Amino acid sequence: LVELDRPNAVEDRLRVRPDHLKFLDSLGDSLLLAGPFLNDKGESVGSIVIIESESLDTARAAFNRDPYIEAGLFDMVMVKPWKTVVNRMRA
């Protein structure tokens, strides 16, 4: 899932963030990676969330429960299948 914030969404993002984090936690082991995109000032301007899902429809249904989406935070939301080719992630 790739999401880009609508303009001037910082306050809404901060207000809804605790519920968004609870939502991410509720995804359990299906959640592989999540975090914000940042602008030059270090402010959040979007998000990426990668989950393991049995289908694209199941993934969309899960993401539609995200409080960020329910709050209308994003200008653009894109759900796409993804395949790991190289993984050098470090926590």
Where are these regions (language model features)?
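Conserved, structured core segments of small domains
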Residues: 1-91
